[in-house]
């Protein structure tokens, strides 16, 4: 769970090994970043039941998008209403990276566009694209929970022109080109997957990347340019960033 102070996580006491956590923080794959942590014993309660009952707070993006759980009722309407039951997947609009991509998409003409949602999480980005007129969305995630959750959220929103599969960027081999690619993952995976993304872009295809810090942008821009992409612009919010590219 993202908080203003960092990331909060939970693990069963019997499965926790401090030595493993220490070794992982020592090799954290971001230059110049030192990870610290503190431990506390959590209250003994049924956390799944708590999450199912309370969900997340409704999120409004640019006063035009409303993202909420099925449990939220009597909310003031919005131009785009998205129902998300996130379970264990990422993507409710509460994180700056998701919000910034949605803000970008609001200003884009998605009519009749084909969209790739890479690392889809809850599927919120792809679902929004269908609501905004995209011809079709093809999504994937390496996590089976996310794939199943995206399918559930597609049903909740009445989405029929979107497909989601389990896998990583290697499953893009042989796919037709997309008009728009969305990838909200992290710096290292993006750097590794950029060649696969470019392989399914045609001239004038665009790509929005996020899931990384402002200081990571030069590496990503350099890699993208080496693959024949043109940097268009970027956005920032509280040290998180998005990048927009176009294939030449």
Please tell me what each predicted stretch does.
Residues 88, 92-170:
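Conserved SAM/SAH cofactor-binding pocket of Class I
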Residues 142-248:
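S-adenosylmethionine
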Residues 80-86:
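A short, charged helix-loop
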Residues 36-38, 66, 136, 161-163, ...:
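Conserved beta-strand segments of alpha/beta enzyme cores
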Residues 1-76:
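N-terminal auxiliary segments of SAM/dcSAM-dependent transferases
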């Amino acid at each position: 769970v993202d908080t203003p102070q960092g990331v909060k996580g939970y693990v069963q006491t019997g499965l926790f090994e401090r030595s493993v956590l220490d070794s992982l923080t020592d090799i954290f794959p971001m230059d110049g970043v030192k990870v610290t942590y503190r431990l506390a014993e959590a209250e003994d309660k049924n956390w799944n039941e708590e999450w199912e009952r309370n969900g997340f707070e409704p999120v409004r993006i640019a006063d035009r998008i409303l993202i909420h759980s099925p449990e939220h009722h009597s909310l003031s309407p919005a131009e785009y209403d998205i129902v998300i039951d996130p379970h264990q997947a990422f993507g409710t609009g509460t994180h700056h990276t998701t919000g910034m991509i949605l803000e970008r998409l609001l200003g884009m003409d998605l009519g009749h566009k084909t969209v790739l949602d890479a690392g889809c999480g809850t599927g919120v980005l792809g679902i929004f694209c269908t609501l905004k007129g995209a011809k079709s969305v093809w999504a994937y995630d390496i996590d089976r929970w996310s794939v199943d959750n995206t399918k559930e959220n597609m049903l909740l929103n009445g989405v029929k022109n979107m497909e989601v599969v389990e896998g990583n960027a290697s499953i893009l081999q042989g796919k037709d080109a997309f008009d728009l690619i969305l990838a909200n993952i992290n710096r290292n995976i993006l750097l590794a997957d950029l060649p696969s993304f470019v392989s399914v872009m045609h001239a004038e295809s665009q790509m929005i990347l996020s899931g990384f810090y402002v200081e990571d942008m030069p590496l990503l821009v350099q890699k993208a340019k080496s693959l024949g992409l043109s940097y268009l612009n970027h956005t920032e919010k509280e040290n998180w960033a998005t990048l927009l590219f176009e294939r030449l």
